[in-house]
Amino acid sequence: MSMKFNTENPSYEWVVFQGKSFSVTVKGWGCEGSYKWNVYANIYDNHPLFCNPEAAKCLHFHGGCTYDKYITTDETEYKYDWQKQYKTLKVGSDYMHYMDYFEDENPCNGIPFTIKWDAEQLAKELLEISGEHNVE
């Protein structure tokens, strides 16, 4: 699992699972007493759900899917023949629903257990759909 920290806008992002056709990330951000949490599935163009965003929204998400967007990543300059434009379907959920209690969970302390469990279940579901095998 890797972690990234952005000092301009305090946020933490963990890669909970990285597969060949998708990754699952958890993001924690905010300031003292008002933290926000998100879980995202980043679905690549070689995953069966990439062309079916409606089905992707039905994945295991806390409170349902609250975010979906196709994201295009492009190289600033193409120097090599392997460089190309990449598209990702990013779908996710937040933990800011009525009766959620994660506002006090500081990302400095890591991912709260419930959120990590949700992210792991999402990864298992995406693995099953993709036919990939977990090599951990």
Regions found by a protein language model. Give the residues of each.
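Acidic interaction surfaces
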Residues: 1-136
